[in-house]
Amino acid sequence: MLKKTLAALAIGSAVLAAGQVMAADYVIDKEGQHAFVDFKISHLGYSFITGTFKDLDGKFSFDAAKPEDAKIEVNVRTASVFTNHAERDKHITSKDFLDAGKFADAKFVSTSVKPTGKNADGKLTADVAGDLTLHGVTKPVVVKATFLGEGKDPWGGYRAGFEGTTSINRQDFGKMMDLGPASNNVDLYISFEGVKAK
């Protein structure tokens, strides 16, 4: 009787463990530069300026079977802005705009993840809500995110990748130089690849 009880407990424990898939922890691949944040903003309503932030890092936890439990944190160095024009980059990082000398980092921390199904390519999608801190001000934003895939890499690691889009009003994040209402909206695109922590 004791042997049967122990066997039943062992089987039950194995089944329970199999059902409790733990989200894996990942570090965003900064070293390999497999992460970036791009932006697009109207210039006075006459054209568009596009650019990117070249220095960012972060971490996330994710399990494709339970995407609603995912968590992410991304940190961006504001001084790393690049718009292919040195004088403009200098102006963007000045006190007129990002004030990178005072506010060196912009930060996004997720607060919830709401799965929204799959896109036309069959990729998982979700609304990732979180707090964005920029220019010393924290505001809630929602990122439309897509899980691009996961798997082993050639170097013995395991990777997972995502992309996402959102839009913000830059005037919501403290007083910046006024360029008119057409230049307040900023479209953001983020793509990153994480390496599973060992």
From Swiss-Prot:
Listed A to Z, the keywords are: Periplasm, Signal
Name of the protein:
UPF0312 protein PFL_5802
Query: Membrane spanning segments where?
Result: none
What does the entry list under GO cellular component? periplasmic space
**Cellular location of this protein?**
Periplasm
The lineage's top-level taxon is Bacteria
Q: Which SMART domains match?
A: YceI (SM00867)
Signal peptide (UniProt feature, chain positions): 1-23
Q: What family classification does the UniProt entry report for this protein?
A: Belongs to the UPF0312 family. Type 1 subfamily.
Q: Which organism is it from?
A: Pseudomonas fluorescens (strain ATCC BAA-477 / NRRL B-23932 / Pf-5)
Q: Which SUPFAM superfamilies match?
A: YceI-like
UniProt key word Signal: yes
Entries under Pfam families matching the protein: YceI (PF04264)
Please tell me whether the keyword Signal is annotated for this protein: yes
Q: Gene3D superfamilies from the entry?
A: Lipid/polyisoprenoid-binding, YceI-like
Quote the HAMAP family the UniProt record gives: UPF0312 (MF_00780)
